[in-house]
Amino acid sequence: MESQRNILLIGLLFVSFLLWQQWQTDKNPQPVATESSVVASTVTDAHSADVPDADAALPEAVAASKELISVTTDQLTLKINPVGGDIVYSALVGHKLEQDKEEPFVLLQQTKDIYYISQSGLIGRNGIDSSTKGRAHFSSQSQAYTLADGQDTLEIPLTYVADNGVTYTKVFTLHRGKFDVGVEYRINNTSAEQLQVQMYGQIKHSIKKSESSMMMPTYRGAAFSTADTRYEKYSFEDMADKNLDKKTLGGWAAMLQHYFVSAWVPPANDQNTIFSSVSAGGLANIGFRGAVYDVAPGTQQTISAQFYVGPKDQEALSAISESLNLVVDYGFLWWLAIPIHWLLMFYQSFVGNWGVAIILITLTVRGMLYPLTKAQYTSMAKMRNLQPKLQDMKERFGDDRQKMGQAMMELYKKEKVNPMGGCLPILLQMPIFIALYWVLLESYELRHAPFMLWITDLSVQDPYYVLPLLMGVSMFLMQKMQPMAPTMDPMQQKMMQWMPVIFTVFFLWFPAGLVLYWLVGNLVAITQQKIIYAGLEKKGLK
């Protein structure tokens, strides 16, 4: 009994420490790059010197709305600047900015508060985009493109003819039901000169802190992948300290925020360079430089890459790049969070309600732990039967804790009681609790996911704090069903009496889905306790 209560307290402190540690990590990340892979940000990288700087492109990028090319599919609304062919606006059609409004969630944008765009171009000896030559001014056959009913693919061709007569066609390809955008350059070298070009793609983002809280930590910043490192965050602080410059086969570069991601994915079989920089104007850039292509006179060449702009949909991200789904970061318990997420999706596909799916997960976990729970309550019942003897020992030995401990161990051995027998179910629940916490925090499917009545979004805290209060009441009832051991010292008794209150206060700011899991778990535990105790009473254990 006493051990169980101590473990419960340790569990609370453990969870609190983990949440605080993760919050500190995301709010104050440490540089992770090594000297061999980066150069100081004050030094110009020779390989990226020709990539248009964020500040250099800024005046041209902020074009009037009537000059931008509009693209609409069933999933995306994009705006493309004909100067350079940059994607300067993206709205996610099926994702609302706020639950009670029809306004779509906007990811890429240019406003007074945030500058966040996707840029791509051709650099190199015959590149049409550079920091010195400026950007290519493309022409388009239309100012608006829409994916029509019955149409699965939409292409947006932009054309630029260089002074030497070479035609560069930049083609954006979008598909029904998808958030990825194919970006392809088709080069028709009608000149007598051999061309040498290199494609680049980069994401530019004004440095902005994530809107985190201790109970809802989120990450806003960059991330990348190479052949050696499948996934690594590279925060704005890292980018300001060091320029990233990693050569790799394949790879990708991304900007992350809560539930959403934008990412450039170059060809997996090409030798690419993942780079980053921070401009003097406060824009953070991360992207790739692709392989160098030679285009002989009278020939044509195609160079392409993929750009993703949308939710952190693990299936969609995995289809683009094997490791891109890792931007859904479940932390050190990812191995446990992944099956929990799968099971949550499985249940939801049947019941159609995320809250009910969480309840089913709770019942599943409690069912799996039932044999251990039964052993726990059996051990507790045996411990209760020993309370008179333990109380007698306390009176005999007084403050002599050493003799008291020795006598207790001898008694446990004689009566075949394991004082730690009630701890295992609690210890096993804590990793599940933490893993579910990160699933609720990271899985975009739970954003704006309703349950019932006043719970309209399981990914945020209960607006009226009803679930946390009910959870506190359930803990109080559980505590009343498990009388405190007489051997527990007064300080421990006071602490345990306050545990339901402490837990309730902590859970006020937890996502409603997580509180629902804990509340239902408590109710199931109370039911199991009554059933198990009824069986134990028949065996003479009370």
From Swiss-Prot:
The keyword Mitochondrion does not apply. The chain crosses the membrane at residues 6-26, 326-346, 350-370, 421-441, 458-478, 501-521. Its main location: membrane. It is found in: Cell inner membrane. One of its GO terms (cellular component) is plasma membrane. Gene3D superfamilies: 2.70.98.90. One of its GO terms (biological process) is protein transport. Signal peptide: none annotated. InterPro entries: Membr_insert_YidC, Membr_insert_YidC_N, YidC/ALB3/OXA1/COX18, YidC/Oxa/ALB_C, YidC_ALB_C, YidC_periplasmic_sf. It holds the Pfam family 60KD_IMP. Disulfide bonds: none annotated. It comes from the Bacteria. It is a multi-pass membrane protein. One of its GO terms (molecular function) is membrane insertase activity. Keywords: Cell inner membrane, Cell membrane, Chaperone, Membrane, Protein transport, Transmembrane, Transmembrane helix, Transport. Required for the insertion and/or proper folding and/or complex formation of integral membrane proteins into the membrane. Involved in integration of membrane proteins that insert both dependently and independently of the Sec translocase complex, as well as at least some lipoproteins. Aids folding of multispanning membrane proteins. Belongs to the OXA1/ALB3/YidC family. Type 1 subfamily. Interacts with the Sec translocase complex via SecD. Specifically interacts with transmembrane segments of nascent integral membrane proteins during membrane integration. This is Membrane protein insertase YidC. It comes from Shewanella loihica (strain ATCC BAA-1088 / PV-4). The lineage of its organism: Bacteria, Pseudomonadati, Pseudomonadota, Gammaproteobacteria, Alteromonadales. The gene is yidC.
